Amino acid sequence: MRVADFTFELPDSLIARHPLAERRASRLLTLDGVSGALAHRQFTDLLEHLRPGDLMVFNNTRVIPARLFGQKASGGKLEILVERVLDSHRVLAHVRSSKSPKPGSSILIDGGGEAEMVARHDALFELKFAEEVLPLLERVGHMPLPPYIDRPDEDSDRERYQTVYSQRLGAVAAPTAGLHFDQPLLDAIAAKGVETAYVTLHVGAGTFQPVRVDNIEDHHMHSEWLEVSQDVVDAVEACKARGGRVIAVGTTSVRSLESAARDGVLKPFSGDTDIFIYPGRPFHVVDCLVTNFHLPESTLLMLVSAFAGYPETMAAYQAAIDNGYRFFSYGDAMFITRNPAPRGPEEQL
């Protein structure tokens, strides 16, 4: 399969650069994985697609204000995007500057703070901060908005680029399907008899990196840390036993569950995953998916195509464009039931 198979033309006006006034105000495009039928709804209509006994699995990672600005001791300006917190003082980060800092050099952080460049690990820099890094980021860091939201972060992004159920600090990008849920909607879901469970996957900046090969089978995924607990495994098993459906909220929840079930059986798992889900890969756990609209030629679009079928996914995206849906992190959403026999790019509608 070629990366070019997953391209589409998106008008710039459909890129959502700000969230709507209310989380639940988004639109919802539903895709029946069996029939391929589409329906245009509001996000609150999601309740109509849920059944008592279903299990919704959310990613409870919390975004850290991971973008810092500063300067080298020589005076040159730089920008830091923390990719992963290693311990209380050390991080791996992307550093953008005219010249890369050298090991042993000092970095002065705007707003107060200092770091030392310890070592370089391929594209990432290991930095050691003089003070504890998480309090420093909370104090002077900026929310790491995706590159397609081409504006400076605002105070409101500290709330809106965060799910209402986020708990575990560590992500540098939000699990955006969860941004549509407010507490009253979560309460209504529970009142309908739908169970909930929480995995953790700390989304990395690599989620925005383009696929740089022609054939997707040659692509190597970036690594991200996740945890699927025994409680989640028990909840999934109970759901399946009662005939319920496992509904993943977001591609990160899919990647978490399917990473923990690579041999076909879901087991507790804690550690890094580089799972790459593209058309042809089977799903062992997830039955339905809530997800946003993703970038052309992205691994996330490939995952959705594996779940819903390639022709059905691309047709749904064209319908979304034709009907003015808002795309990407602050955009609208889809609800997809899994296609039992998904087709690839070679099997067009």
UniProtKB/Swiss-Prot annotation:
UniProt EC number: 2.4.99.17
Metabolic or biological pathway, per its Swiss-Prot or TrEMBL entry: tRNA modification; tRNA-queuosine biosynthesis
Function: Transfers and isomerizes the ribose moiety from AdoMet to the 7-aminomethyl group of 7-deazaguanine (preQ1-tRNA) to give epoxyqueuosine (oQ-tRNA).
Coiled coil: none
Catalytic activity as recorded in UniProt: 7-aminomethyl-7-carbaguanosine(34) in tRNA + S-adenosyl-L-methionine = epoxyqueuosine(34) in tRNA + adenine + L-methionine + 2 H(+)
Keyword Heme carried by entry: no
Record carries keyword S-adenosyl-L-methionine: yes
Main location: cytoplasm
Entry-linked NCBIfam families: PRK00147.1, queA
Family: Belongs to the QueA family.
One GO process term, biological-process aspect: queuosine biosynthetic process
Entry GO MF terms: S-adenosylmethionine:tRNA ribosyltransferase-isomerase activity
GO cellular component labels: cytoplasm
Entry protein name: S-adenosylmethionine:tRNA ribosyltransferase-isomerase
